[in-house]
């Protein structure tokens, strides 16, 4: 019986976390779910965010023998973890902006995240705790989330537009914390926009290590490679392109849970 790992995000950016976990635990059974009906999460109220994530995750936990849940969304992680941990009797892991490792290597740090993550008191508490003497500049962008989603279905990133978004940081930061799971997919483009000397840090590898630790390093009793399953909350006009993306990552075709935004 394989270990069942549920990875959840508002979009497909959480696949950056999936890749890191898959590298650590290649023989687990993966279920990926994303709430495209309410994408992007950065624009939801906390109560709606909690209600939606709890509903979708509970539904999938009743459908599969889930061993661990990974909230692969920084915005959701700052809000929903307490309620999910209270409701579920399995480990729930969230993602946290990698402020601590960034502060160990630089004092000119940029935190790139969604507008919601940038505004949360949780984010400021992280900076106060782990980078109290660093110059940490915050930049929130919903458009970057959209650009990452577009790239993953084959649409080229407009470097000129990206440079404009990142222009406040030109020559002002040397280390960027990628505080959204979508942003690792834009690493090459960010370096083109700000220069190759920029150090980019994300929390994907640390999350993967934590998941492996919580599962005691166990995966499956045999060496069978399991095909993952993927669920969305609403039909998508991009279904064909999405299926291509997921197929390359060893997932079956997209399935719809049918959970509209309103």
From Swiss-Prot:
Primary gene name:
murI
Query: Gene3D superfamilies from the xrefs?
Result: 3.40.50.1860
The record's comment on protein family reads:
Belongs to the aspartate/glutamate racemases family.
Protein name, as recorded: Glutamate racemase
| Keywords associated with the record | Cell shape, Cell wall biogenesis/degradation, Isomerase, Peptidoglycan synthesis
Q: In which pathway does it act?
A: Cell wall biogenesis; peptidoglycan biosynthesis
Fetch the InterPro entries from UniProt: Asp/Glu/hydantoin_racemase, Asp/Glu_race, Asp/Glu_racemase_AS_1, Asp/Glu_racemase_AS_2, Glu_race
Catalytic activities: L-glutamate = D-glutamate
What is one process in the GO biological process aspect for this record? peptidoglycan biosynthetic process
EC number of this enzyme: 5.1.1.3
Looking up PROSITE patterns in the UniProt record yields: ASP_GLU_RACEMASE_1, ASP_GLU_RACEMASE_2
Residues annotated to bind substrate: 9-10, 41-42, 74-75, 181-182
Q: Where is the active site?
A: 73, 180
The GO molecular function terms of this record are: glutamate racemase activity
Give the top-rank taxon of the lineage listed in the UniProt record for this protein. Answer: Bacteria
Alphabetical list of PANTHER family matching this protein: GLUTAMATE RACEMASE
Q: Name one Pfam family in it.
A: Asp_Glu_race
Tell me the function of this protein: Provides the (R)-glutamate required for cell wall biosynthesis.
């Amino acid at each position: 019986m394989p270990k069942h790992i549920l990875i959840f995000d508002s979009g497909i950016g959480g696949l950056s976390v999936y890749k890191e976990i898959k590298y650590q635990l290649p023989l687990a059974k993966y279920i990926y779910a994303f709430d495209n009906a309410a994408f992007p999460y950065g624009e939801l109220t906390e109560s709606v965010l909690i209600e939606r994530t709890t509903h979708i995750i509970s539904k999938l936990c009743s459908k599969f023998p889930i061993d661990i849940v990974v909230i692969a969304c920084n915005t959701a992680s700052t809000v929903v973890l307490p309620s999910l941990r209270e409701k579920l009797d399995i480990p729930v892991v969230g993602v946290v902006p990698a402020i601590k490792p960034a502060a160990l290597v630089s004092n000119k740090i940029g935190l790139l995240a969604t507008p919601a993550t940038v505004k949360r008191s949780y984010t400021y508490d992280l900076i106060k705790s782990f980078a109290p003497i660093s110059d940490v500049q915050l930049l929130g962008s919903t458009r970057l989330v959209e650009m990452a989603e577009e790239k993953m279905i084959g649409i080229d990133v407009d470097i000129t537009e990206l440079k404009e978004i990142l222009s406040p940081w030109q020559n002002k930061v040397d280390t960027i914390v990628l505080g959204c799971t979508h942003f690792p997919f834009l690493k090459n483009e960010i370096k083109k926009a700000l220069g190759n000397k920029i150090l980019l840090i994300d929390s994907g590898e640390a999350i993967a290590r934590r998941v492996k630790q919580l599962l005691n390093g166990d995966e499956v009793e045999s060496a069978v490679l399991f095909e993952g399953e993927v669920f969305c909350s609403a039909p998508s006009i991009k279904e064909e392109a999405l299926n291509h993306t997921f197929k390359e990552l060893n997932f079956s075709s997209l399935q719809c849970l049918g959970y509209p935004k309103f």
